[in-house]
From Swiss-Prot:
Keywords: Antibiotic resistance, Methotrexate resistance, NADP, One-carbon metabolism, Oxidoreductase, Plasmid, Trimethoprim resistance. Signal peptide: none annotated. Pathway: Cofactor biosynthesis; tetrahydrofolate biosynthesis; 5,6,7,8-tetrahydrofolate from 7,8-dihydrofolate: step 1/1. This is Dihydrofolate reductase type 9. Its EC number is 1.5.1.3. Key enzyme in folate metabolism. Catalyzes an essential reaction for de novo glycine and purine synthesis, and for DNA precursor synthesis. Homodimer. It comes from Escherichia coli. Residues 3-167 form the DHFR domain. It catalyses: (6S)-5,6,7,8-tetrahydrofolate + NADP(+) = 7,8-dihydrofolate + NADPH + H(+). Confers trimethoprim resistance. InterPro entries: DHFR, DHFR-like_dom_sf, DHFR_CS, DHFR_dom. Belongs to the dihydrofolate reductase family.
Amino acid sequence: MASLNMIVAVNKTGGIGFENQIPWHEPEDLKHFKAVTMNSVLIMGRKTFASLPKVLPGRLHVVVSKTVPPTQNTDQVVYVSTYQIAVRTASLLVDKPEYSQIFVIGGKSAYENLAAYVDKLYLTRVQLNTQQDTELDLSLFKSWKLVSEVPTITENKTKLIFQIWINPNPISEEPTC
């Protein structure tokens, strides 16, 4: 299995979403996401894919959905039915020269199902209290090691903290979910 990365942004209370959207608008966070995930294979759930404004250029999307048939596949979007198949598919695709890494980008179910298999977490802490209806349990990463932390203040005067965490014991077998 190829190395897995995860990228997520959370507010002060672990919120990651509100009504299937990111509950804040911080261009610096979006620029960071783009820079980190460019030329990568992205694994995501169906609702996360639906929340994107468009297919993200320079990245291949592997979408986990039990309801969308594989006949909807395109050059940039591959539908699969389980996280196990998503990881297997992404591992095969990352061998192509145009893709260098695999990233789990959401939503909550993808994060929870794949966290134990992830080697590296790119976590953005958005220092805001926002409306939310979806939270990520950050205790999933309690045994991980913080290796990088870069704070910044946005044009909107919001503090963002870009962190990188390493999983000391990722599961090396394919997921069974």
